[in-house]
């Protein structure tokens, strides 16, 4: 073998010329103890609160407790591979997630990493997870409707764009069903391709079973709703820090649409589980417990999240972010700590009851306890025209329902009231996955409050409604179009509608 001195020296010269003197500088600390998703780290003197840190093997964590001699870090992942003495690096960045339209149709984890096997995400940019809510000046009062396609909600508890409306009830009362229907209902605006009316949806699943999340994704895909939806999943098997951060991550993704003049809807399903995850983290970090062992700042945990939902003024692009948080109660106890907190933060609540659900009244909305504090300003005039009287009649019916058992002894006026109430209650029932267009809801409720159902057997109300709507679509679509475009029932439209209903009632059998 021949040794060429000239060649060797040329290679050595080249190596020396390209030798980089710049060493990689990182501030590091050492793990003192680890367990239950929490690591105590010594060092990291300059770490910021909420900063991302990196453990060996690429596992990320977030610095939450900054104490005199150590830092309490919550671990976003499996802590079994982290051991005492491991080196922890500062990343210099606060926790952030990808945002943009590239996320639509995807399922991501709490840190924005795709978990649906469809390849990497093309994000517009990355934004911080925990940012301040918009101030008072850039906001505008809620004035545009956010249609859910559910008669009971759109008529009695209307929701506007930029509103925060709580959905509260025991387990298995149909909370998620209402929310999934709301997402599916937005398809009609996406199909119409009206950019101003489109509503992008974000569904944040916190602490739910993986099978449940998979089922929801499948349902949304089947109905073509995944095209405008992002699903953020932090399931029950994920560590508490990921369940805690997921709602904020989803909210940041929604804020991208709000701040770019678009409209978004975010669903947190559910915040009780986020509060439980936060309680677990806080207790393990040895923060002092308060009522029901929740930490003292659990109110702030939810208020800073829900205050980020807003309707922006014209100067700020006129976008909006509507929030529908979910709270699960135990035995219909609305006066527990977390439910009362969230009720006081939101602009109203939809209260679902087990008893109604088992009676077959679905959606099981308790109309008496449910309110919408700002939604009436967003309701279209046509719905206001018919919904005013249905509220009153249902309230009177609930008051009188206690006497319904002694129906034979009641005067005709009360009997009539009870009969009307029973039919209106039947009219507000709606099967799952069949949201209605606003103009159809208006016609359906109009028929109820104007007495067209009074002579019909209660069991036939559903059939009457479906026949009426299919008949009106085929024979008098101009009535539907008039209500949809004018957003009110004008005198001419009402005349046509009355004539149509009179004729239809005679033929219905």
From Swiss-Prot:
Residue sites binding ATP per the record: 169-176
Assigned keywords, A-Z: ATP synthesis, ATP-binding, Cell inner membrane, Cell membrane, CF(1), Hydrogen ion transport, Ion transport, Membrane, Nucleotide-binding, Translocase, Transport
UniProt keyword annotation of Transport present: yes
Compartment(s): Cell inner membrane
Tagged with keyword Iron-sulfur: no
Record-linked InterPro entries: ATP_synth_asu-like_sf (IPR023366), ATP_synth_asu_C (IPR000793), ATP_synth_asu_C_sf (IPR038376), ATP_synth_F1_a_nt-bd_dom (IPR033732), ATP_synth_F1_asu (IPR005294), ATPase_a/bsu_AS (IPR020003), ATPase_F1/V1/A1_a/bsu_N (IPR004100), ATPase_F1/V1/A1_a/bsu_N_sf (IPR036121)
Entry's Gene Ontology cellular component terms: plasma membrane; proton-transporting ATP synthase complex
GO MF, one example: proton-transporting ATP synthase activity, rotational mechanism
Annotated site residue numbers, Required for activity: 370
UniProt subunit comment: F-type ATPases have 2 components, CF(1) - the catalytic core - and CF(0) - the membrane proton channel. CF(1) has five subunits: alpha(3), beta(3), gamma(1), delta(1), epsilon(1). CF(0) has three main subunits: a(1), b(2) and c(9-12). The alpha and beta chains form an alternating ring which encloses part of the gamma chain. CF(1) is attached to CF(0) by a central stalk formed by the gamma and epsilon chains, while a peripheral stalk is formed by the delta and b chains.
Function: Produces ATP from ADP in the presence of a proton gradient across the membrane. The alpha chain is a regulatory subunit.
Protein name listed in UniProt: ATP synthase subunit alpha
């Amino acid at each position: 073998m021949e040794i060429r001195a000239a060649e060797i020296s040329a290679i050595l010269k080249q190596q020396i010329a390209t030798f980089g003197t710049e060493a990689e500088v990182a501030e590091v600390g050492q793990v003192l103890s680890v367990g239950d998703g929490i690591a105590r780290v010594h060092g990291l003197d300059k770490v910021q609160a909420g900063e991302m840190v990196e453990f060996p093997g690429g596992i990320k964590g977030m610095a939450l407790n900054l104490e005199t001699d150590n830092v309490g870090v919550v671990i976003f992942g499996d802590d079994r591979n982290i051991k005492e003495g491991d080196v922890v690096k500062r990343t210099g960045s606060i926790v952030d997630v990808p945002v943009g339209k590239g996320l639509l149709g995807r399922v991501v984890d709490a840190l924005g990493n795709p978990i649906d096997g469809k390849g990497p995400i093309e994000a517009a940019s990355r934004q911080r997870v925990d940012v301040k809510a918009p101030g008072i000046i850039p906001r505008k009062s809620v004035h545009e409707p956010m249609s859910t396609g559910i008669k009971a909600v759109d008529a009695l508890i209307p929701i506007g764009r930029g509103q925060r409306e709580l959905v509260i009830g025991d387990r298995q009362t149909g909370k998620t069903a209402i929310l999934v229907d709301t997402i599916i209902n937005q398809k009609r605006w996406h199909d119409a391709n009206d950019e101003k009316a489109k509503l992008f949806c974000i569904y944040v699943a916190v602490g739910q079973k993986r099978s449940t999340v998979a089922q929801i994704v499948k349902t949304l895909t089947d109905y073509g709703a995944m095209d405008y939806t992002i699903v953020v999943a932090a399931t029950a098997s994920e560590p508490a820090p990921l369940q805690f951060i997921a709602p904020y991550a989803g909210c940041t993704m929604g804020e991208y649409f709000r701040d770019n003049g678009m409209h978004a809807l975010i669903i947190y399903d559910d915040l009780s589980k986020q509060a439980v995850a936060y309680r677990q983290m806080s207790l393990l970090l040895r923060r002092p417990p308060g009522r029901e062992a929740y930490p003292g700042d659990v109110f702030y945990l939810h208020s800073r999240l829900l205050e980020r939902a807003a309707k922006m003024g014209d100067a700020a692009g006129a976008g909006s972010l509507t929030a529908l948080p979910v709270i699960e109660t135990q035995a219909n106890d609305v006066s527990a700590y977390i439910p009362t907190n969230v009720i006081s933060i939101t602009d109203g609540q939809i209260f679902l009851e087990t008893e109604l659900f088992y009676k077959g009244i679905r959606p099981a909305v308790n109309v008496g306890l449910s309110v919408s504090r700002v939604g009436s300003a967003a309701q279209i005039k046509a719905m206001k025209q018919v919904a005013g009287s249905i509220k009153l009649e249902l309230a009177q019916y609930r008051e009188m329902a206690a006497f319904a058992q002694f129906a034979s002894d009641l005067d005709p006026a009360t009997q009539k009231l009870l009969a009307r109430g029973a039919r209106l209650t039947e009219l507000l029932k709606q099967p799952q996955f069949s949201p209605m267009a606003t103009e159809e809801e208006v016609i359906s409720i109009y028929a109820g409050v104007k007495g067209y159902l009074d002579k019909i057997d209660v069991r036939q109300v559903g059939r009457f409604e479906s026949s009426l709507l299919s008949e009106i679509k085929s024979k008098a679509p101009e009535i539907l179009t008039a209500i949809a475009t004018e957003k009110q029932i004008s005198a001419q439209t009402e005349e046509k509608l009355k004539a149509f209903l009179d004729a239809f009632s005679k033929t219905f059998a």
